[in-house]
Amino acid sequence: MLRRGAASVNLNIEHADFDEWLEIREPKGDVNRQSLNLHQCAVVGDKFMRKLEAGDQEARVRWSKLLQKRKATGEPYILFKGNTNKANPPAYKSNSLKVHMTNICSEITLHTDESHSFVCCLSSLNLAKY
């Protein structure tokens, strides 16, 4: 039995398109702005959390929208980037490697940059045996 593939888009909560991005899974409006089967992960950094704690009104509104959407739909997932990078293994820390995103289930947090990417492989088949 085959399982449908899935993909996730990670976007920083402070990105200019964040509010529009929150709506891409809604089956309404312009179909060219919809992506009903794409999963979402909101990347939240320490800088944003400090703004939120300080009572920054714009941050509070954005955070509220995120939580309302999550309550209504179960998404987006939330990656706390600062906490993730604080928990990086020593090899990452000693080489200044940072995690910027995660996979759909959030169990894979690998360094990514212009030269490095990662993929979540749920299973594989070694065809060399056959």
Question: PLM features: residue spans?
Answer:
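Active-site cavity-forming subdomains of large catalytic enzyme subunits
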Residues: 1-129
